[in-house]
């Protein structure tokens, strides 16, 4: 949020020479995080008001003029191509040294004395867009020069002085104000500054509510819980015109765009008080105003003419004919201010925070008003906003007349009252503060304080009673921040720590991530805990039993993650555009509706939240066998490298997303813990994967059992060479490598040190129903170098064993 220091000075008497760095620091330490303090006037250095005395045609350019311009004490020639130049016109002149954007585009450039088409030019006559004032002085013409003739500023006046731009703008981090609805306006920030420095505050003038309702206008609130207060004021004898410059520039400084006087009054009041308001064209309201929930099938007509279907959970502003706006979020076309508007109804209301938040999220339309309503505004602030609004209307429209004022306040806010023992406060703060000191500081913030022995009774002001301050700890925080956190002395705490608990599941997760990322070269991804409906339908092929969010980020993302695979496939689609081959993985919780009972509160029924690990291997290569072996190898070797119980593979239940042939279920003992399969072609197409084959695996990480301990054994490096001996065998097509490897491992020989898979081949040179299987034997002795005959003898023994079990024969 942007805060104007000049605006703050309207409400609190800050010294003219106030230390701005200290102010920003004190606010940050006590109240809100001030991210930056910008001297707005510094952007307009070396810029002055100039008066064009004469205009002559440029001798060498048809579209350029030579303007003799009074810049205060002297007249200079300035070449300009503006379309609206005239003699006697006041303009913004950027002198040499000023920084501007040429036609408002690109980076800032330094203005220098130059020669344009043979004529000397001392500086530049500027359009609003070239000095960053396009929103304050909008124009549709590119060559339009900023006309300052209406400003009472003689030639040579610094532009920042003439346009009231000498101001300090504080940039406040909105996150630091999330629980402080009282700070979303200049008056709330001023109140904090006044309390910090014990300065007096200026109050808004009071508007007399004794108004005769001559128009018969009235308001009905049907849902008092969603709308605790609604004030409506009917005002006649107004018109659409520009707001005065002082109002426009304040609105612009704080990041909004001035529109017209009627709309700008509502913007100004919101920026001043933090209370949103809305002006309706009274001639377009049929009957009276009703605050109610939308009915099934109702729509809101937007300014662009589109019809917005509404939810029955939406709180609306309606008249006798239908919906005119979404309460606290946005208005519709029917109620909008038009050039012919002469009579308005001013709405200043209080709405339930949660309802506004749901509606704003539902339609992805978070406005300045809804952002404030979402924080739970004090309903008493409607009075302050009404007082200021009426003052502004009477100032801008001296002939205006209030013909109706209705204040529906069915649910008054109850001020919070909290008892805090001073002894408790002392123990928590680690310091004893005198009751008088506490009382003085707290009363500066608007609290009512009384003492009875050790007890301090606190009456919380309404602007802090909307949930912000409700318990003893909140009062402790208020006392501490007003005293100054930096004024508490730090004392070392003596304590003892128990040894760290060995959390095997956390260690297992860390080792899995290290194995997949470092050893296997996979990229870890992080996705949202919700899934897009299109990917759910494509991969899981059903939404049955999947939990959904009551307020999803978008209608298409309402399903809670029940599997990691839909989001993994979405990531494959995004990466397919950039890579021919890649592998990714994710470890995260999945949520399933299994009547899970919280271990912390048995009364609380939650969905199960089990950790899963899933990965995808994607390639444009058509070799499915190689892709399958790569993925299977990664999963198979995981058990060894992360030190957990061995995983095995069977075909028992095909996943719905899997290819009809290339799939396996993953088991730990007799328990199925996951799946490994090629993504079916139709599923790939449904996901939008165009030219890639994708192998997926998913494991229930919580079902994997880490081994509690392990014993590492070490052997000496071999003194004699080890021989790799390749054997190619013809075996039946159904023979699996794992069975061959198991047979080789069962051979008792001190010279045989292992066997590794090399290749598998089916083709023209191999008989039908057979396949060629190549394995590599590691043969050697720890005592000597083996002869060729000894090596052949070991290899023959292996061949005979395999031939006996599988009917294999040596392929020649």
Predicted regions and their residues:
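Short, hydrophobic beta-strand segments
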Residues: 4-10, 167-176, 228-236, 368-375, ...
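Terminal amphipathic helices with adjacent charged low-complexity linkers/tails
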Residues: 195-222, 397-425, 432, 475
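Extended, well-folded interaction surfaces typified by the phenylalanyl-tRNA synthetase beta subunit core
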Residues: 418-582, 778-782, 790-812
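Conserved mixed alpha/beta core segments that line enzyme active sites in large multi-domain catalysts
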Residues: 48-79, 266-334
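Conserved catalytic alpha/beta cores of large enzymes that bind or transform nucleotide phosphates
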Residues: 129, 240, 308, 312-414
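Phosphate-backbone binding interfaces of nucleic-acid-interacting proteins
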Residues: 1-207, 345, 362-364, 368, ...
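Glycine/proline-enriched, intrinsically flexible loops and inter-domain linkers
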Residues: 4, 11, 25, 65, ...
């Amino acid at each position: 949020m942007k805060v104007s220091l000049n605006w703050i000075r309207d409400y609190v008497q800050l010294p003219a020479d106030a230390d701005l760095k200290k102010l920003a620091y004190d606010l940050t330490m006590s109240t809100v995080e001030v991210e930056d303090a910008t001297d707005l006037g510094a952007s307009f250095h070396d810029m002055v008001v100039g008066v064009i005395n004469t205009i002559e045609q440029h001798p060498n350019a048809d579209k350029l003029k030579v303007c003799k311009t009074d810049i205060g004490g002297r007249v200079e020639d300035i070449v300009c191509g503006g379309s609206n130049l005239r003699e006697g016109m006041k303009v913004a002149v950027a002198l040499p040294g000023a920084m501007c954007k040429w036609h408002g585009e690109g980076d800032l450039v330094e203005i220098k004395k130059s020669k344009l088409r043979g004529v000397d030019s001392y500086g530049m006559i500027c359009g609003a867009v070239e000095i960053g004032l396009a929103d304050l002085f909008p124009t549709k013409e590119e060559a339009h020069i900023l006309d300052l003739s209406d400003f009472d500023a003689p030639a040579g006046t610094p532009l920042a002085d003439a346009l009231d731009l000498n101001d300090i703008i504080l940039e406040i981090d909105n996150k630091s104000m999330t629980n402080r609805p009282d700070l979303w306006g200049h008056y709330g920030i001023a109140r904090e500054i006044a309390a910090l420095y014990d300065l007096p505050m200026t109050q808004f003038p009071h508007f007399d509510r004794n108004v005769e309702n001559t128009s018969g206008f009235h308001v009905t609130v049907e849902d008092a819980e969603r709308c605790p207060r609604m004030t409506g004021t009917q005002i006649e004898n107004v018109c659409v015109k520009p707001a005065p410059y002082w109002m426009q520039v304040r609105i612009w400084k704080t990041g909004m765009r001035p529109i017209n006087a009627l709309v700008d009054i509502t913007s100004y009041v919101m920026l001043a008080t933090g209370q949103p308001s809305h002006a309706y064209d009274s001639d377009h309201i049929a009957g009276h105003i009703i605050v109610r929930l939308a009915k099934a099938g109702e729509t809101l007509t937007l300014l662009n003419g589109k019809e917005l279907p509404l939810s029955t959970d939406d709180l609306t502003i309606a008249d006798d004919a239908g919906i005119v706006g979404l309460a606290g979020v946005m208005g519709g076309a029917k109620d909008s201010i038009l050039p012919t508007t002469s009579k308005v109804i001013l709405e200043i209301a209080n709405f339930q925070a949660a309802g506004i938040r749901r509606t704003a999220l539902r339609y992805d339309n978070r406005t300045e008003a809804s952002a404030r309503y979402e924080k739970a505004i004090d309903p008493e602030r409607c009075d302050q906003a009404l007082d200021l609004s009426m003052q502004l209307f009477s100032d801008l429209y001296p002939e205006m007349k209030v013909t109706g004022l209705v204040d529906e306040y069915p649910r008054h806010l109850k001020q919070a009252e909290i008892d805090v023992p001073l002894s408790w406060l002392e123990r928590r703060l680690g310091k004893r503060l005198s009751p008088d000191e506490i009382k003085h500081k707290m009363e500066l913030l608007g609290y009512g304080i009384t003492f009875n022995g050790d007890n301090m009774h606190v009456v919380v002001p309404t602007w802090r009673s909307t949930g912000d301050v409700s318990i003893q700890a909140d009062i402790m925080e208020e006392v501490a921040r007003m005293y100054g956190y930096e004024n508490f002395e730090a004392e070392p705490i003596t304590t003892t720590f128990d040894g760290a608990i060995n959390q095997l599941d956390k260690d297992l997760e860390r080792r899995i991530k290290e194995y997949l990322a470092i050893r296997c070269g996979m990229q870890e991804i992080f996705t949202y805990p919700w899934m897009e409906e299109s990917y759910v339908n494509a991969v899981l092929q059903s939404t049955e039993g999947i939990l959904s969010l009551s307020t999803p980020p978008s209608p298409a993302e309402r399903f809670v993650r029940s599997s990691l695979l839909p989001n993994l496939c979405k990531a494959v689609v995004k990466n397919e555009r950039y890579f021919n081959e890649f592998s990714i993985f994710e470890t995260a919780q999945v949520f399933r509706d299994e009547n899970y009972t919280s271990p912390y509160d048995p009364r609380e029924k939650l969905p199960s939240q089990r950790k899963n690990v899933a990965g995808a291997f994607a390639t444009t290569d058509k070799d499915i066998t190689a892709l399958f072996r790569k993925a299977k190898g990664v999963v198979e070797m995981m058990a060894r490298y992360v030190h957990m119980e061995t995983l095995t593979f069977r075909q028992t239940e095909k996943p719905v997303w899997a290819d009809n042939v290339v799939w396996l279920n993953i088991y730990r003992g007799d328990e199925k813990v996951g799946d490994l399969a090629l993504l079916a072609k139709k599923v790939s197409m449904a996901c939008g994967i165009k030219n890639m084959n994708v192998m997926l695996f998913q494991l229930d990480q919580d079902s994997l059992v880490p081994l509690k301990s392990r014993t590492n054994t070490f052997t000496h490096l071999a003194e004699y060479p080890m021989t790799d001996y390749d054997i190619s065998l013809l075996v039946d097509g159904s023979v699996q490598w794992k069975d061959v490897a198991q047979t080789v491992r069962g051979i008792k020989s001190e010279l045989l040190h292992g066997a590794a898979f090399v290749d598998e081949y089916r083709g023209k040179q191999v008989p039908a129903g057979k396949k060629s299987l190549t394995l590599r034997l590691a043969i050697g002795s720890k005592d000597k170098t083996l002869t060729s005959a000894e090596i052949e003898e070991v290899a023959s023994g292996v061949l005979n064993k395999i031939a006996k079990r599988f009917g294999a024969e040596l392929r020649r």
